[in-house]
Amino acid sequence: MPGNVVSPKVLMDLIPKLKISMQETDKNEVIKNSEQHSSVSWDPDTCENLYITLEEQIESKDTLAREQALKALLLTLDATNKRVEPYLVRLLPRVLKQVGLEKVAAVRTQASTVAEDIIKTMNPYAVKTILSHVTNSIKTSGKWMEKMCAFRLLDMLVEKAPCQMSYRLPELIPILSESMWDTRTDIKNQARKTMTSVCTLISNPDIDKFIPVLIDCIAQPEKVPETIHTLGATTFVQEVHASTLSIMVPLLYRGLNERETTIKRKSAVIIDNMCKLVEDPYIIAPFLPKLIPTLEHIKETIGDPECRSVVNRSLATLIRVGNVKEGKIPEVLNIAKPENCMETLLSILKGQELVPVSDVYLNYISCIASQLIDEKNNEVVDWDVNISPYLQPIILKADINCIIDQFRKRSISGFHSSSAESEEEEGEDLCNCEFSLAYGAKILLNRTSLNLKRGYRYGLCGPNGSGKSTLLRSIFNGQLEGFPTELKTAYVEHDIDDTESKTSVFDFIANDPSVVVKNKQEVISSLLEHSFTEDMLSIPISNLSGGWKMKLALVRAMLRQVDILLLDEPTNHLDVKNVAWLENFLTSQTHITSIIVSHDSKFLDNVVQAIIHYEHFKLKKYMGNMSKFITLVPSARSYQDISMSEIEFSFPEPGYLEGVKTKQRAICRMRDIEFQYEGTSEPQIKNVSLQVSLSSRIAVIGPNGAGKSTLIKVLCGELIPQKGEVWCHPNLRIAYVAQAAFVHLGSHENKTPSEYIQWRYRTAEDSETIDRASRQLTENDEHLMNKIFKINGTSRKIQGIHSRRKLKNSYEYECSFLVGENVGEKNERWVPLPSMNNEWLPRGELIESHSKMVAEVDMKEALKSGSFRPLVRKEIEKHCESFGLDAEIVTHSRIKGLSGGQKVKLVLAAGSWLKPHVIVLDEPTNYLDRDSLGALSKALKSFEGGVVIITHSVEFTKNLTEEVWSVQNGQMTPSGHNWVQGQGTGPRLQEQEEEDTFDALGNKIEAKKKAKKLTSSELRKKKKERMARRKKGEEVFSDEDD
């Protein structure tokens, strides 16, 4: 930039002299001798005239005139003189044109210097008006030197105005991408360098390391598939801005148009994960016209259903984030357009006493304001500093600060909602922090804030998998960014760690270093005060029921001196009495803050003072209890009424049971059952009789420790009663989901749900049932199996039972034998007989001595009657989809990464794989969110088989169950039952047509249809037809119709 800056009046006089003064010394002498040097003010009218003159001179056909005009223009450049900037920008396209057209190197160099100095003097917030000229040269100029100069100007702008330029990337990157394919090598190389420079403005740590690869993909599209694979393993946790989308969307668009389905799918997954982190619909709006039609085309044409579901999910995310309504993509925000700012400015200046000024000047001010609006900058200081220098020369009397403030408020108002600030609670702040939270490759919360007050009770609500438990664990483990480390917390989750299962109840409390009471008597008193009996203090925790385990964990948390109680599903397993006890404790605490995760809406209604709700990766606080929250957020009405759930589950059809003609007929029966655990003083259940049919809808209720779970385990064969009889239909299939549902998944956490189901049913039977007590041989069983049968005059013992067939109203079984030699003597021995000597024995003869072997054969026949399902990925995904688990979770996520609710859904799906006739659920409401509870309730209601449920949730069972088994002190009292002998009444069940069957690899087995036997009249008709054909001389065979 020159050292001497000359006023407009002086320059107007100097320009004719500069035309004939070729030497620099002559030029300086003219300037030096001018009496008016720097004495005339830069008023807008003089500036306007000066730059009109310079514009004419620059476009003159006279080379000398152009050079002198450029020299004169260089003299006007002054970074401190803001009022000349609008006119300099107006001349920039002409200056750039001279770089490309001028054949005289001196003039070309002069033009290039002027262009660069214009960039140096510009206000950084004026990038919009500058860029329009620079990018126009790149797009339209046919002169390569002009383009090269434009690229250099972009590099300078990146250094001068990095923040402002980052907002312009969506416009810049497509232009630079096109230039990277220019036929001229110089342009191509410079475009790549400028692209690399521009991309340094992308501030997103998630993709920083991939930017060089993303630039490579623009120049080398063959690298797109590999880059998509690499990005597919990236965890997106940072908020996504327009600059990030500007470099990612071109790659993803190409990925969606690749031929390989896997690349299309991964591109859709990345779009879904990344766009969830876009907070403003206007950020994503410019990219929607490219992405949405492409995804819709893939959805309509792709053959892979799993890929289609991923594409659907991505589409749903784009529609939600982009605020697309009725298929109409919203227009890009126009509030920040310079012409709109100009209109606002003119309306404010109307009626003011102004110096006459051109639209060029006002447009420059509008472009600065437009950039401030783009950045959502509402700071008074920034508006004053960047607008005031340009308004001051043209406003004569009015208060400039007042005008600028009015301009700011009216311009920025479109970004701010008129709604009132959300209500805040009063009191001492425990924490007020901002953080992001992720689990594995999944973003849970993005730059959200958490404010907690002392003594308040907060309900933490959100759907399964949103990250509620992860947030509580992160707080407890001190892993939450910005959370005060000095705060003491206690975390109570769904179950006590297995490592402490052998610890006694007393030691569990006394050995905890965080517990305040250390005196033995104080520990005992505290436990007795909370309803534990003296007998319970010495028993191991593993002997406690689920409800008492939860209560023990809660008592320990209460006895710690903590600031915050973190309760994860605290009402799980608790009966009504203990839920009331917990409510009373929590509401009585004025010093302890509680954060509670629970799907029990009544409990939350009675306890919490505010709801913290997961909404689009943010935590939003609503003051009041659950009922008030529902009124504020009507979309969450399923929290209060599970029947309002909009999602659906479905259980598979159970299939036909041989001999069962109506749904009232008993398919499972218990008579005078008694069971007692080893080491206990009295039976857990006694004198229990019951029966279950296909129409059963049974709720098992009772206080904690009454024996409900024990009763169910005996019914399902998990436990063997010491007295009484348990009978089940030979072909009966029961799905049992235990109270501690996660026990099914314990050793499979590194498998995907699909792999777990494949493992569980790899032999066609349920591997989880192999270790059931009803299938284990005891010493007594082995003694009974030594029974000797007299067959065909020989003494025989049964070696194995292999198959079964119908025998009147029962069955008979094919048995292989050992034949006895010298039976009863010292040298007695038993020799296996060949299979040709197998015999069929009736069920009645075998059941007393070989009941468990008979049961094994019955179970295999039951599996056959259920029809084998292909144990392949697509079938498993389809089955799990019926329980709210999408293919992404089933096939591509490990079990250890699933939430509690998702694990329960998986256990339900896995348990029902064999199409059970009876579903037995022990506390199914634990961990499931409200929508899932509603879906499960409706699915059980429409299920064609029997249902037995243990639950303390009256809300869940009130419209579902008709029969109640009330368990108190080991005694069961049934009510509402309709037990019948024989078939009973009601519609007759018909055996359904056989479904398609498959082998283990999923190949369909074509069943051969049995030839239909012809009637005597049909045989006579066939015979006549043959004789008629023989008369005609045709060759006919009598057996051709057989």
UniProtKB/Swiss-Prot annotation:
List the SMART domains: AAA
Q: Which intervals of the chain form a coiled coil?
A: none
Q: Where are the HEAT repeats?
A: 9-46, 86-124, 167-204, 206-242, 243-280, 289-327
Query: Which pathway does the protein contribute to?
Result: Protein biosynthesis; polypeptide chain elongation
- Describe the location of the ABC transporter domain by residue ranges: 425-642, 668-994
Q: Which UniProt keywords apply?
A: ATP-binding, Cytoplasm, Elongation factor, Hydrolase, Nucleotide-binding, Protein biosynthesis, Repeat, RNA-binding
Keyword Cytoplasm assigned to the entry: answer is: yes
**What's the domain of life for this entry?**
Eukaryota
Q: Where is this region: Disordered?
A: 1009-1042
Binding residue positions for ADP:
N704, E923, N926, H952
Q: Where is the composition biased (Basic residues)?
A: 1020-1031
Q: Which reaction does it catalyse?
A: ATP + H2O = ADP + phosphate + H(+)
Pfam families, per database record: 4HB, ABC_tran, HEAT_EF3_GNC1, HEAT_EF3_N
Q: What class of enzyme is it?
A: hydrolase
- Subunit structure of this entry? Monomer.
The job of this chain, per UniProt, is described as: Ribosome-dependent ATPase that functions in cytoplasmic translation elongation. Required for the ATP-dependent release of deacylated tRNA from the ribosomal E-site during protein biosynthesis. Stimulates the eEF1A-dependent binding of aminoacyl-tRNA to the ribosomal A-site, which has reduced affinity for tRNA as long as the E-site is occupied. Assists translation termination by stimulating the release of nascent protein from the ribosome by release factors.
Could you identify this protein by its name?
Answer: Elongation factor 3
Organism the protein comes from = Pneumocystis carinii
